[in-house]
Amino acid sequence: MRKTYPDLRSFLNVLEEEGQLVKVTEEVMPEPDIAAAGRAAANIKNGPAVYFEKIKGYKYSVVTNVHGSWANHALMLGMPKDTPTKEQFYELNRRWDKFPVKPKVLGREEAPCKEHTITEDINLFEVLPLYRINSQDAGCFISKASVVTGDPEAPENFDKLNVGTYRIQVKGKDRVGIQALAFHDIAAQLEKAERKNERFPIAIAVGNSPLVTFMASTPIKYTQNEYEFVGALQDGEPCEIVKSDLYEHLYVPAGAEVVLEGYVEPRVREVEGPFGEFPGSYSGSRKQCVVKITRITHRTDPIFENLYLGIPWTEIDYLMALNTSVPLYKQLKADMPEVVAVNAMYTHGMGVIISTKCRFGGYGKAVAMRLLSTPHGMPYSKVVIVVDEYVDPFNLEQVMWAITTRVKPDKDVAIIPNCPGMPLDPSSVPAGMHTKMIIDATTPVDPEPNPREVEILDPPAKSEEWEAKIRELLGR
């Protein structure tokens, strides 16, 4: 079994060899067949990727549920497909420390994503087999692309190159809308461009190597580069990238199936959504930025990779599980070395379970509050459960045992109102605000011993005399 994959196709080959990919050879309807298969595959334990060879009305193929099981997730890491989730967590944690690994920049002629170029009469529907994912979506959405942008104030700073996953609504043959929420890196960059009333360069890579997609969905620091993390997670093997055709400072995955290049027109907003989102409900509509596509490059017979979102668990829950858990663990561990593990696999970290050794009374609550102040925990995390170091946070039976036998509801549950929240959460009212809850299910630790009654300190002898003398010296 190979350990790393330069592109989506090499990973699909391994999935097929391992019995984790099924091919549908008969022609299917884009709606509802593709989304229905994505939902169905997620319902099956260790569900496979589903590859559709023929889509009615379209030229090219579609694959879904590529990351949609722990078996596929393990194969992505080059591990046996039966590797337990907790072992995958610790393996990711080990590789995380290899960051940064500089990417390998290929020439244009070496990059598969540059095999074909379209600059005139651009029509996204001729390149991508687009479809609605859920029946009440506002239109066709691209749900699994890696969006590449730079910092307008420091475009040559590679550390500030952002590769992120954001939902993309197709608004026309050469126009798309992108949801850029306030706490997303892309929103901070767009704001800088709009302050100068400048067009915001953008590249959208569709169908990437599994770890590029994985890192594009990972909450890391603004100055940490996703491509350098891909190299780390590939155990030191560099990620292959290539320069954008339109912008000197943007780099895209060299093995991408399709790359859309263009710009965001400054200060232009259009209604985007509704869209069936990862919490399992429709998100409603908001005014979002609009991208004009001016160039497309693609591989021969490109594969459109998309994912289904619905009531968990679906592919997105596997994709955004351990890559949320590991950075939160690293951030907590740096300040609180007693932390043993973090399970943030539930609804993209809206629910988090932390295991830790408690140094003193109230330590469990302190760990939870630290998590709620991290860049991801602040807007996303809503319910935080803390358990002892010997409780496995990835074993819900153990976690429930800790809650039912350790928690005193009047002392161990903290409710924190009026906090930043994830606006896509249907319980966030008004949108973007949350009430957070901490459940401290750790074994109580004795406070510092204090056997005496409180003794009030008397001032030292002659304090009044010295006060008078100091006033005299001051002339007061």
What spans do the regions from the language model cover?
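Extended, highly charged
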Residues: 1-275, 280-290, 294-476
